[in-house]
Amino acid sequence: MPSSKPLAEYARKRDFRQTPEPSGRKPRKDSTGLLRYCVQKHDASRLHYDFRLELDGTLKSWAVPKGPCLDPAVKRLAVQVEDHPLDYADFEGSIPQGHYGAGDVIVWDRGAWTPLDDPREGLEKGHLSFALDGEKLSGRWHLIRTNLRGKQPQWFLVKAKDGEARSLDCFDVLKERPD
């Protein structure tokens, strides 16, 4: 069941008078009915990629230190972080030094996602299967919760074996399409 204040943790970590990040107060107006996803390249204290899936009025979010990979043999660590507001999917800018997440953010990829099973059940049970239809990422993917210990839940982002999969030796999407 979704929290009654799903963005409380997000808001607690930010001072919206000093950061250009969206506050989440303006609801997103979308008539397509599609669920959006985005991947943001975030040059913070360490470069990483923020993977976000729209669900229940927020963006469920994971920090992926090495970024997504099109090779099904490669599991990329994805650390679950606080939910973000829907309008964050379009955010690009510089978060000021001294603030949570300080650094430059660009939208690296965006598109629509389709859950292949019940997404709420998948998140609860620790295995979310979905399809992406984006500018750089497409096809079937999995988020699989691990037993790794950490302050936040640890998952793996894994590309499924399908027609969109590519060996990392032949094609590294992060190097071939860096921006």
Tell me the role of every PLM-derived stretch.
Residues 1-179:
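A charge-rich, low-complexity, intrinsically flexible signal that marks solvent-exposed coils, linkers
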